[in-house]
Amino acid sequence: MIIRPVDEVRGELNAPPSKSYTHRAYFLALLAEGESTIENPLVCDDTLATIEAIRSFGAGVDGKTVVPPEEPSPGFVYARESGTTARFSTALAGGIGGKTLIDGARRLRERPMDGLVKALKGLGAEVDGFSLPLTVKGPVKSGRVSVDASKSSQFVSGLLLLGAEVGLKVEARNPVSKPYIEMTLRTMEAFGVEFEREGFSFEVYPGVKGTRYKVPGDYSTASFFLAAGALYGKVRVNNLLREDVQADMAFLDALEEFGARVKRGRDYVKVEGGELKAVALDCSDFPDSFPILAVVAAYAEGRSVIRARQLRFKESDRVRAMAVNLSRMGVKVRELEDGLEIEGGRPRGAKVETFNDHRIAMAMSIAALGATGPSIIEDTESVSKSHPGFFDDLRRLLE
């Protein structure tokens, strides 16, 4: 795809539904007593993988309606490229008698599963393998577990869902991306799950109630459009609730640190450009924002440092991917173990790679809009992983 620079970006969009909440709602509907309706679900490659997964466990899915089985049954889960699908399915398989096989695409086979596997083994499940493909044979025999969550909060969220299935005490050690755990808990509450907590130690009681659940808008995908407003003009994104706990709400604070003007409405966010200055940021609790924050840093005056310790375990090695692409655009970048040091300026048009990573594709598309010449973004089809309509929305802002 060729993207040419523009003079400004102005407009208004509706945020797509949240991918993270959609995943959680479908898995809870699998475990529920009674039928559930998932309103406003995100339809993308990752959430389709989750729908296929809950079907393999015995759920009936007809559009937005989920009819749970009397008891989930073992089966085969192919998670495509969805880490959430793979990890939640692995955890829930621990509560099922019989063997479940979980597998995924090549990059997903490289992503960490070890913390979750060790936790399930500690609960008495039989698990063959520490990365995909792996088999899980339940049911678990113990009701208390401590999990190393330093590589992914999804290990914790998966065990919380297992707790809603069988009852469980879960202690999360060194958790990253903590807001995603809060999102899991909030969705559990919507499905009537009862739990107690002290910090990041939880006691979850079994029992999930079928419900009608409306998926909120997605701050994560909205961040790319809001960044375009900060860099090139003014953008408003609707369907973003102020009273939410999504991880990427912190992206708005980061934009303000850079110097952008941010207005938070009850159900919208508006961002307008300002004089952008370099910042030092740790986005370990909202790592999905790292690629687009690196782009903002490339246009900000001065030297920024953007960090997040789990970045190398995502759909791509996002530290390396952004270092390669920004360097091709003439940006001075130094790669750190857990992030990037970026000297801001005016990127030039270039041919860049997406590394088959949806967030790299989206971030570099926004970067290209302000470059000194046209850019070629390779393999943009990866955006279908989280927002198939991304480029349609971007064109609306450029009309």
From Swiss-Prot:
Gene Ontology BP annotations: amino acid biosynthetic process; aromatic amino acid family biosynthetic process; chorismate biosynthetic process
Physiological role: Catalyzes the transfer of the enolpyruvyl moiety of phosphoenolpyruvate (PEP) to the 5-hydroxyl of shikimate-3-phosphate (S3P) to produce enolpyruvyl shikimate-3-phosphate and inorganic phosphate.
Binding site for phosphoenolpyruvate: 19, 83, 111, 154, 318, 359, 385
Known EC number: 2.5.1.19
Subcellular location, principal: cytoplasm
Transmembrane segments: none
A cellular component annotation (GO) from this entry: cytoplasm
Keywords: Amino-acid biosynthesis, Aromatic amino acid biosynthesis, Cytoplasm, Transferase
Record note on quaternary structure: Monomer.
Protein name (Swiss-Prot/TrEMBL): 3-phosphoshikimate 1-carboxyvinyltransferase
Active site: 288
InterPro entries in the record: Enolpyruvate_Tfrase_dom, Enolpyruvate_Tfrase_sf, EPSP_synthase, EPSP_synthase_CS, RNA3'P_cycl/enolpyr_Trfase_a/b
CDD domains: EPSP_synthase
Record has Transmembrane helix as a keyword: no
Binding site for 3-phosphoshikimate: 19-20, 24, 152-154, 288, 310, 314
Catalyzed chemical reaction(s): 3-phosphoshikimate + phosphoenolpyruvate = 5-O-(1-carboxyvinyl)-3-phosphoshikimate + phosphate
